[in-house]
Amino acid sequence: CGILGLGGVGHMGVKAFGLHVTVISSSDKFVVDVAASNLDK
């Protein structure tokens, strides 16, 4: 299973499926957003 995009619906999908998340981003701000969403980094 894969989810492209972690904003809005993507974030809800990750939580609903209890998926392992790998985040690839050039922005440190995005990593902070993931941490604030109670998702594993």
UniProtKB/Swiss-Prot annotation:
Pathway: Aromatic compound metabolism; phenylpropanoid biosynthesis. The keyword Oxidoreductase applies. It catalyses: (E)-cinnamyl alcohol + NADP(+) = (E)-cinnamaldehyde + NADPH + H(+); (E)-coniferol + NADP(+) = (E)-coniferaldehyde + NADPH + H(+); (E)-sinapyl alcohol + NADP(+) = (E)-sinapaldehyde + NADPH + H(+); (E)-4-coumaroyl alcohol + NADP(+) = (E)-4-coumaraldehyde + NADPH + H(+). Its cofactor is Zn(2+). GO terms for biological process: lignin biosynthetic process. GO terms for molecular function: cinnamyl-alcohol dehydrogenase activity; coniferyl-alcohol dehydrogenase activity; metal ion binding. Binds 2 Zn(2+) ions per subunit. It comes from the Eukaryota. Keywords: Lignin biosynthesis, Metal-binding, NADP, Oxidoreductase, Zinc. Its EC number is 1.1.1.195. The keyword Ion transport does not apply. Belongs to the zinc-containing alcohol dehydrogenase family. Involved in lignin biosynthesis. Catalyzes the final step specific for the production of lignin monomers, like coniferyl alcohol, sinapyl alcohol and 4-coumaryl alcohol. This is Probable cinnamyl alcohol dehydrogenase 2. It comes from Pseudotsuga menziesii (Douglas-fir).
